[in-house]
Amino acid sequence: MKFSPLLDEMMKALQVLPGVGPKSAQRMAFTLLERERSGGLRLAQLLSRALTEIGHCSHCRTFTENERCEICANPKREENGLLCVVESPADVAAIEQTGQFSGRYFVLMGHLSPLDGIGPEELGLEILERRLKDEAISELILATNPTIEGDATAWYIADMARAAGVKVSRIAHGVPVGGELELVDGTTLSHSLMGRQPLN
């Protein structure tokens, strides 16, 4: 069904968000216009501001409004010498929410994918290589996604780290906590068996 051209444009624009199809976009647009106009205006203002003002940290490449993000600006995060490499700022947020990591990050903003034209330069690996040589990094933790591209990216970076004399580790992959073995796919189970840990 056709609505006003502006409403149609609004619904198409909402579909750029992940998981939002035509029906969800229509529901969101109608909600904003029917009963959330002030919230919609606030959202529009914040979106405009965020898209204009938020850039990348010059040190780790995560999102920030400043030259350096809060994590990179915090000297306590340098003390243990840990550097964790992730694919996206969302991965930084996920790790930070665990409260288990107190080191620093490097955000690739993707993974190696020659077919899509994404090579080492697009991932800022020259910046990472410089950090490996110039900073006191005791261990590089590779937390790329457990995909073919994520694994290839991890191996590429591991070679770089070894060449710089930095210890390298990869986050564990496997059976989720509370999961049942019979429901786990073969690849995940295989990774779990290969990455098994001794019980002390």
UniProtKB/Swiss-Prot annotation:
Signal peptide: none annotated. Residues 81-176 form the Toprim domain. Gene3D superfamilies: 3.30.60.80, 3.40.1360.10, 6.10.250.240, RecR Domain 1 (1.10.8.420). Keywords: DNA damage, DNA recombination, DNA repair, Metal-binding, Zinc, Zinc-finger. A zinc finger (C4-type) spans 57-72. It comes from the Bacteria. SUPFAM superfamilies: Recombination protein RecR. GO terms for biological process: DNA recombination; DNA repair. GO terms for molecular function: DNA binding; zinc ion binding. CDD domains: TOPRIM_recR. Belongs to the RecR family. May play a role in DNA repair. It seems to be involved in an RecBC-independent recombinational process of DNA repair. It may act with RecF and RecO. This is Recombination protein RecR. It comes from Aeromonas hydrophila subsp. hydrophila (strain ATCC 7966 / DSM 30187 / BCRC 13018 / CCUG 14551 / JCM 1027 / KCTC 2358 / NCIMB 9240 / NCTC 8049).
